[in-house]
Regions:
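Short, solvent-exposed loop/turn segments at secondary-structure junctions
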Residues: 88-91, 133-135, 285
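Beta-barrel outer-membrane channel/assembly domains of diderm bacteria
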Residues: 2-124, 150-163, 191-195, 227-240, ...
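Residues on the solvent-exposed faces and adjacent turns
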Residues: 128
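C-terminal hydrophobic structural anchor segments
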Residues: 271-329
Length: 353
């Protein structure tokens, strides 16, 4: 019995010497496939917001996500991801506070899709997946958005094509009987490299198929003053530690139908990087009037102009921090949005495995 008690601390000591892996946790499957991978990430955020017409506020927030990747065959795989505040379009955060923990109940499905690669140079995604569409910023799609439907990418050397059928609503009665709402996306991308210079350009369109009152929850009816079909133009230039990119969008709305962002990044060294963004988003320029755009600017997310400055710091391979400052104002004073003279400071600590 005494011998057994001696073995216990020895075993625990040996376990303590084993360093955790800084990558997905993998369980090998049949036929040499890496059948199951576990992955996840966590963010701690502090932000402070002030403005000309609001009181100054501060809040601490968090986001947690974990997922599973599974390969059934060489051509078929699947992925599921779960997260905080799953009722939102994006992987948003929940605010600290133990007196009201109801936001803990909103932990659920974030992404769930199957991927097929059995066709040459082609990847097909079926289900709830990230946007398969070139965009260099979060103006059109937030980076962690999940679109539901079928998307595909075909790539052959310098040219690629992105296509998709995205379901917004099905069998929803908004006063006209049960209707569906969807969009179809199509984009061509050209990529080239000259020595250490990499360049990519894209042109595409999102065709919204919905009645005037469909998808009313996002105020996305297709009246003349609202966003219907949207043309997209993108350019991305990378040269060593420097990157310059721009996104430009225009919709069929009769007014306030242009959105663009230009941003530059510079990687100072392995640990430090800086970014600068110029934002201009008119009220009816984006699909569904901006229902899937970024949500970090204070106030409304459309009918805004402003800037974003960011400092990135790499602490370890899977641990980093960033400091962000947003400053925005209304574009069209006749449209009721709450962006007047607002600023937001964010500090993020991000960890993943």
């Amino acid at each position: 019995m005494t011998t057994k008690f001696i073995y216990v601390p020895i075993a625990l000591s040996l376990m303590a010497l084993v360093k955790p892996a800084h990558a997905d946790v993998t369980i090998e499957g049949l036929n040499g496939l890496e059948a199951v991978k576990l992955f996840g990430d966590m963010r701690m955020r502090f932000e402070r917001t002030d403005g000309d017409t609001i009181d100054t506020t501060s809040r601490a927030r968090l986001r947690a996500r974990f997922g599973i990747k599974y390969a059934a065959t060489e051509n078929w795989s699947a992925q599921m991801r779960f997260r905080t505040t799953s009722s939102q379009h994006d992987s948003t955060h929940q605010t600290f506070g133990i007196t009201n923990t109801t936001d803990n109940d909103d932990f659920g499905l974030d992404r769930a899709f199957m991927k097929y690669t059995g066709i040459n140079n082609t990847r097909v995604y079926i289900g709830k997946a990230a946007a398969v569409y070139m965009h260099s910023s979060e103006l059109l799609f937030r980076d962690d958005i999940a679109l539901e439907g079928v998307q595909a990418n075909w790539t052959n050397n310098t040219f690629s094509v992105n296509a998709g059928h995205i379901i917004l609503e099905e069998n929803v009665d908004n006063g006209e009987g049960k209707r569906d709402a969807s969009w179809q996306q199509l984009q061509g991308v050209y990529a080239a490299q000259f020595n250490d210079i990499k360049f990519k350009a894209g042109i595409g369109s999102i065709f919204v198929s919905a009645s005037d009152t469909a998808y009313a929850s996002a105020e996305s009816g297709l009246d003349d003053d609202q966003a219907g079909n949207v043309m997209t133009y993108n350019a991305d230039l990378r040269m060593g530690p420097f990157r310059l990119a721009a996104d430009y969008y225009t919709s069929e709305a009769q007014s306030d139908n242009i959105a663009y962002t230009v941003h530059a990044r510079y990687q100072i060294n392995k640990e430090l990087g800086v970014r600068f963004y110029i934002l201009h988003t008119e009220a009816y320029a984006l699909p569904m009037n901006g229902a899937f755009t970024q949500t970090n600017t204070p106030g409304s997310y459309t009918n805004i102009k402003g800037t974003r400055v960011q400092l990135d710091y790499k602490i370890a391979d899977n641990l980093n921090a960033d400091l962000r400052w947003y400053s925005v104002d209304n574009l069209n004073k006749d449209i009721a949005t709450n962006n007047e003279g607002r600023d937001r400071l964010q500090v993020n600590l991000n960890m993943k495995f």
